[in-house]
Amino acid sequence: MTVTYAPRTDAPRLVAGKIRDVDVVLDLGPGISPQPYLTRCLHICVDAHRPYLERVARERAGDPRYVLLNATWDQAIGMFPDKSVDSVFALDFIEHLDKQDGLRMLREAERVARQQIVVFTPHGFFPQSYDDPGKPDRWGMDGGYWQTHRSGWAPDDFGDDWDIVVCHDCIELDQNNQPMARPVGALWALRTLSPPTPRRHQVVKDPSVWAHVKGLLEQGLPPPVFRRLQSVWGGVLRRIGRA
C-alpha cells in the first residue's frame, strides 16, 4: 500500500493524475453529482434514489454518454459480467453502506472492473444522519435515508494493493451545507488492476477527413515514422500551394 498525504489545495490534482482515461465507467451511488474526472466515456450511473437520477437527466440534457440505472448498487452490479467495464467509481458512497456491505462492494468492483477502482470517502467515521423522514437532504430533496452515514473508512481497510491519498482538511461543510468549525479529513483509494491500455475509440475533435486520418496514423505508427510522414506531406502541400 502507498499512502500519500496532501493538503486540500493539492489533493484533487494529485488524484486526477492517477486516474486512467478509459472508455466505460460504472459510477455507483453518484447522487446528483456523477464522477467529474472522465468526460469522454460511456458513463453508467447507478443510484437507488430515482429523483437524483431524474435531476442528472435534466441537467445533462439527454447526453447520450450517460446511462442511468435506478437500482441499489448490489442489484445493478450483480448483472455485470466479470471484467465488463473499464473502471468503477464510488465517490462519497461507501460510507453510506455498513462495513460488511462496503467490503462486499469493493470485491464486486474488483470483479467487474478491467482497469481501475476509484473510491472517495471521509477519513474515519463522519457522523451524518437523517432521523426525521421529513427532513430534506443537503440538496433540498427527499433522499435523507440514502445520505445517512453507516461506516467509517481508513487506509488499512483497503489492503496492500491500493494507492491511498489522504487529505486532512478536505471536507469543510456539514450535512446542511454549513461551514464546520474544523474541516474533516477524507481519502481517495485507487486500485489499479491491469497495465495501461490505449483508449479503444479515437475521438475526432477536427471534423476534417485529414485530421481524422492523421489522428489514426499518429496513434498507430512509431513516432519517428509519423514525424517523417508528416514532414513529407507538409512538403507536398507547400509545393502545390495548399500549406
Language-model region placement:
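S-adenosyl-L-methionine-dependent methyltransferase catalytic module, highlighting the catalytic core
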Residues: 4, 75, 98-242
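Conserved SAM-binding loop
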Residues: 14-129
